[in-house]
Curated annotation (Swiss-Prot):
The keyword ATP-binding does not apply. The gene is RSPH3. Residues 134-186, 225-249, 354-375, 473-498, 526-560 are annotated as: Disordered. Residues 215-239, 331-385 form a coiled coil. It comes from Homo sapiens (Human). Functions as part of axonemal radial spoke complexes that play an important part in the motility of sperm and cilia. Functions as a protein kinase A-anchoring protein that scaffolds the cAMP-dependent protein kinase holoenzyme. May serve as a point of convergence for MAPK and PKA signaling in cilia. Its main location: cytoplasm. Keywords: Cell projection, Ciliopathy, Cilium, Coiled coil, Cytoplasm, Cytoskeleton, Flagellum, Phosphoprotein, Primary ciliary dyskinesia. It holds the Pfam family Radial_spoke_3. One of its GO terms (cellular component) is radial spoke head. Belongs to the flagellar radial spoke RSP3 family. This is Radial spoke head protein 3 homolog.
């Protein structure tokens, strides 16, 4: 069976256009949409290595490596191709580390695998340049491509019999202007830190809520928050004190000042160090700036009359200069005349303006005087009207008060007179001046009399008590008579002399008390009243007994 080369090339182009890119390896198809491939594989003649169209003159082989198939290693048939998806010792979604990625493709090359132990599930690669292969659209020869380890085999495989189709994608068809700008950079993530990749024991799978589409407002708020945080961080970095910039001719260099090897000890070693910098050197004088020479000095000798004839060529120039000078002088004269006319007109205008300004000022002053006179007369008229109204109100109030008080005054004056607000001056003088003095004098006289009575009562009481004692003593002496106690004896004479001396002493004390005004003033009224009450009570108790005792004592004294 032979096929034309043109037909084989067209089939290769169509198959290349329908090619899909698989990024998942042995895990199956990727989630990327179908993309037509613009690049077309270079056309191969029909007699090159191709599994669909073997060359007539030689056996099938690999067109990528020009290697012949292994003897007795390939099989015939047209069964559906099977891609190896698992092998012992590795995860189902990861190919063996020593095999090429082409082994996990959908249509592996049949010329680079050999059967092991005659089974459809055991194939081994025989070509180390399988990455040069491209996926073909035709069916390879009948074989099962499965990889196994030396110790174990894969129990099952995955087959793909459905036609290629675009898988549903969770991305939106059109870009959202709010959440994703036009030129948003593509973010790349590390699959080792992706939360969607399950690690460890799949039996203890953590099931959580699916991540829904984020809200546009929330994304905008997060973006604004990040911008504010970045701006705040930049402001803090600007405000942070930094090392000043180096002077001209110098630069800052990071220098390791600590020891590279530090000894770890129980006690920290303390060392005192000092550093003295050199004194500041005097600034050298600034050299004068001398610019560099940029041109070249060239000398040229020109003889007289060599370039031009001065007398001949100066005439037109001189005519032009003289004409321009005369024209300029005429223009200056005209300008001066024009300026003089302008100054004259300005002077006339100034005079007219000054006269009009004086007239305006006179009229303004006249208007001001008229306005002030008007305001003054209005104020005077208002004051006159105000005074007239106030006077009329006062007259009306006075008439009303007189008419109202005509009957009220007599009764008010009578009540005030009865209350004592209207008084006789003579009577008032007697009440204020004479009666208080009279009461004071009477009170003094009464005090003197009360003091005299009190003193007299005290003297009488003392005499009576003494006579009573003497009388009682005399009765005792009568019961036991002795010659010296007779009535006419010396004892009686002694008692009479003592009594007379006591009476004289009491009388002298009474006179001194009466003459002593300071004593009367020092004695309070309460003390006098208490003493007076006391003496009156004692006097009432004694009564007639005291009088009789006093009479007896006086009689005995007279008899003696």
């Amino acid at each position: 069976m032979t096929v034309k080369p043109a037909k084989a090339a067209s089939l290769a182009r169509n198959l290349a256009k329908r090619r899909r890119t698989y990024l998942g390896g042995a895990a199956g198809r990727s989630q990327e949409p179908e993309v037509p491939c613009a690049a077309v594989l270079p056309g191969k003649p029909g007699d090159r290595n191709c599994p669909e169209f073997p060359p007539p003159d030689r056996t099938l082989g690999c067109w990528a490596t020009d290697a012949a198939p292994a003897a007795g290693l390939c099989g015939a048939g047209s069964e559906p191709s099977i891609a190896p998806t698992s092998c012992a010792g590795n995860l189902p979604s990861r190919p063996p580390p020593l095999l090429s990625p082409l082994l996990a493709s959908r249509n592996p090359c049949p010329w680079h695998y050999l059967h092991l132990s005659g089974s459809h599930n055991t194939l081994a690669p025989t070509c180390f340049k399988a990455k040069l292969h491209r996926k073909r659209g035709s069916q390879p020869p009948d074989m099962a491509s499965a990889l196994t380890d030396r110790t174990s085999r894969a129990p099952s495989t995955y087959t793909y019999t459905s036609r290629p189709r675009a898988l549903p994608c969770q991305r939106s068809r059109y870009r959202d202007s709010l959440t994703q700008p036009d030129e948003e950079p593509m973010h790349y993530g590390n699959i080792m830190y992706d939360r969607r990749v399950i690690r460890g024991n799949t039996y203890a799978l953590q099931t959580g809520p699916l991540l829904g589409r984020p809200d546009s407002l929330e994304l905008q708020r997060q973006r604004e928050a990040r911008k504010r945080a970045l701006a705040r961080k930049q402001a803090q970095e600007q405000l942070r004190p930094q090392t000043p910039e180096p002077v001209e001719g110098r630069k800052h260099v990071d220098v390791q000042t600590e020891l590279y090897l530090e000894e770890i000890a129980d006690r920290i070693i303390e060392v005192d160090m000092e550093c003295q910098t050199d004194a500041f050197l005097d600034r050298p004088p600034t050299p004068l700036f001398i610019p560099a020479k940029t041109g070249k000095d060239v000398a040229t000798q020109i003889l007289e009359g060599e370039l031009f004839d001065f007398d001949l060529e100066v005439k037109p120039v001189l005519e032009v200069l003289v004409g321009k000078t005369i024209e300029q002088s005429l223009l200056e004269v005209m300008e001066e005349e024009e300026l003089a006319n302008l100054r004259a007109s300005q002077r006339e205008y100034e005079e007219l303006r000054n006269s009009e300004r004086a007239e305006v000022q006179r009229l303004e002053e006249q208007e001001r005087r008229h306005r002030e006179e008007k305001e003054r007369r209005k104020k005077q008229q208002w004051e006159i009207m105000h005074k007239h109204n106030e006077t009329s109100q006062k007259i009306a109030a006075r008439a009303f008060a007189q008419r109202y008080l005509a009957d009220l005054l007599p009764s008010v004056f009578g009540s005030l007179r009865d209350s004592g607000y209207f008084y006789d001056p003579i009577e008032r003088d007697i009440e204020i001046g004479f009666l208080p003095w009279l009461m004071n004098e009477v009170e003094k006289t009464m005090e003197y009399s009360m003091v005299g009575r009190t003193v007299l009562d005290m003297l009488i009481r003392e005499v009576v008590e003494k006579r009573l004692c003497m009388y009682e003593h005399g009765e005792d002496t009568h019961q036991s008579p002795e010659p010296e106690d007779e009535p006419g004896g010396p004892g009686a004479m002694t008692e009479s002399l003592e009594a007379s001396e006591f009476l004289e002493q009491s009388m002298s004390q009474t006179r001194e008390l009466l003459l002593d005004g300071g004593y009367l003033q020092r004695t309070t009224y309460d003390r006098r009243s208490s003493q007076e009450r006391k003496f009156m009570e004692e006097r009432e108790l004694l009564g007639q007994d005291e009088e009789t005792a006093m009479r007896k004592s006086l009689g005995e004294e007279e008899l003696s």
